[in-house]
């Protein structure tokens, strides 16, 4: 497997921040505290009583990581009876607000879930709030991580976290709807437009879009411009934004509006949320969805109307342009970081290593993402068709670039998402879009 993950994918470890912090803060109403007696065979001898706190955002019952974290808390206490882990979960924007407030108030936990990329985690690192963990990492742990996967965990030459799982954005197609419409799963842009026309003629919504949250539309421009400019062209523009005001990026903006004018998306796309978009696709309300493989649990749930009816493919190529079907949007996932003021950094890093590997191995087995850790001894016979298809696509990858809001500085990330929303609402022209993009700040990663 080729792994050319950009440093911006700082472990999907997605957007911004400030101030002072302290060590061990408790959870709130959702806090779980584990106890119990005894220790597992091979566990460590009990020593000083230690409590570590961890905040995460895996709270949905459809998120396999929720149970993985809960299990890790119980298992780790059995292995280390003197160590108690208190975990608290909040999701989405609420989590971003909570963690930002906690750091500002000096009430951050020992271990924090962080979104990937420079627009979220890097300001915490620059402010000195997070602990470099190099000196605490064993060679054994590092040897279990797949080649290249620590790159996204490294800032300014220092490792700050460990990978868990990695994600890949795919085009999801409801084969039942395609068959009913007499449409072909697209491999080129022209075939995509033909499929959209046939699906519309059959009275079906071609593509589900939830642009109320802005980032789903951003994913579309991310990949369309990768097909027009190629990932190398994207990297050049991240380093020199003036290049956004050039033919490949204007062409990508034109392609986005071509989709809108072709009635590719649901009419209420600007008022539909991400959750509603995924739920709608799982309910069979749209024939296509472009998203990362974290949508698999929703599509494959027993309650899903599309279970067993969906295939995932690489986004169609645009003939005559620089991009190829082996260039992907994706990268290693968000991760967990240690508070620099943690009173027990060695124990915190040991638990971080345990948790990260467990999410990587168990999460892969349960469809939570693709592996960042050695999984040769993991039974993958239970993987779904979608998980297998997505893993096979990743095997073909020659280049990966993470979501753009992880690449730009925080304010510019918001500007970019706003511009894509305006583009899709037909409020600005492709030329105006490109001109505005050219005024963004260069990414420090390129």
Residue spans of the language-model regions?
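Conserved N-terminal structural module of periplasmic/extracytoplasmic solute-binding proteins
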Residues: 10, 24-120, 126, 139, ...
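Pocket-flanking alpha-helical
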Residues: 74, 93-130, 142-161, 170-172, ...
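Extracytoplasmic/periplasmic substrate-recognition and gating elements
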Residues: 74-79, 84, 181, 262, ...
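Hinge/lid segment of periplasmic solute-binding proteins
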Residues: 116-170, 193, 219-222, 231, ...
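Short, solvent-exposed loop/beta-turn-alpha elements that line the ligand-binding surface or hinge
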Residues: 132-145, 184, 211, 228-251, ...
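C-terminal capping/gating helix-and-loop segments adjacent to ligand/active sites or protein-protein/ligand interfaces
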Residues: 154, 369-378, 388-446
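Extracytoplasmic/periplasmic solute-binding protein
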Residues: 160-164, 169, 193-241, 257
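Glycine-centered hinge/linker elements that transmit conformational signals in sensory
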Residues: 196-198, 238-269
């Amino acid at each position: 497997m080729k792994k050319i993950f950009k440093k911006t994918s700082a472990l999907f470890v997605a957007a911004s921040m400030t101030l002072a912090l302290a060590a061990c803060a408790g959870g709130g109403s959702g806090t779980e505290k584990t106890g119990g007696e005894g220790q597992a065979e091979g566990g460590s001898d009990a020593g000083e009583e230690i409590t570590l706190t961890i905040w995460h955002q895996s709270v949905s019952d459809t998120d396999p990581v929720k149970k993985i974290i809960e299990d890790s808390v119980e298992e780790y206490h059995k292995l280390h009876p003197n160590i108690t882990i208190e975990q608290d979960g909040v999701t989405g924007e609420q989590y971003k607000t909570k963690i930002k407030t906690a750091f500002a108030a000096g009430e951050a936990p020992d271990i924090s879930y962080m979104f990937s990329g420079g627009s979220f985690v890097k300001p915490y690192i620059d402010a000195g709030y997070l602990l470099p963990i190099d000196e605490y990492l064993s060679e054994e742990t590092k040897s279990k991580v797949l080649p290249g996967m620590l790159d996204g965990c490294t800032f300014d030459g220092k490792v700050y976290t460990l990978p868990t799982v990695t994600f890949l954005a795919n085009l999801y197609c409801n084969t039942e709807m395609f068959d009913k419409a007499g449409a072909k799963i697209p491999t080129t842009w022209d075939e995509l437009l033909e499929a959209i026309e046939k699906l519309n003629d059959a009275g079906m919504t071609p593509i589900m879009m939830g642009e109320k949250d802005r980032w789903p539309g951003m994913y579309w421009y991310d990949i369309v411009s990768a097909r027009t400019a190629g990932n190398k062209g994207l990297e050049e523009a991240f380093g020199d934004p003036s290049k956004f005001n050039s033919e490949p990026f204007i062409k990508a903006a034109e392609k986005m509006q071509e989709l809108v004018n072709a009635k590719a998306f649901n009419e209420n796309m600007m008022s539909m949320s991400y959750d509603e978009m995924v739920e709608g696709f799982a309910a069979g309300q749209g024939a296509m969805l472009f998203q990362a493989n974290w949508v698999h649990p929703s599509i494959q749930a027993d309650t899903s109307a599309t279970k067993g009816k969906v295939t995932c493919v690489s986004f169609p190529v645009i003939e005559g342009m620089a991009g190829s079907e082996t260039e992907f949007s994706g990268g290693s996932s968000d991760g967990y970081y240690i508070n620099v003021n943690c009173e027990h950094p060695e124990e915190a890093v040991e638990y971080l290593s345990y948790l990260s590997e467990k999410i990587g191995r168990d999460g892969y087995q349960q469809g939570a993402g693709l592996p960042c850790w050695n999984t040769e001894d993991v039974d993958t016979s239970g993987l779904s068709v979608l998980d297998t298809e997505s893993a096979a696509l990743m095997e073909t990858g020659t280049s990966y670039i993470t979501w753009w809001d992880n690449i730009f500085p925080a304010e510019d990330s918001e500007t970019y998402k706003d511009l894509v929303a305006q583009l899709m609402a037909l409020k600005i022209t492709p030329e105006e879009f490109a001109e505005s993009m050219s005024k963004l700040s260069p990414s420090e990663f390129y």
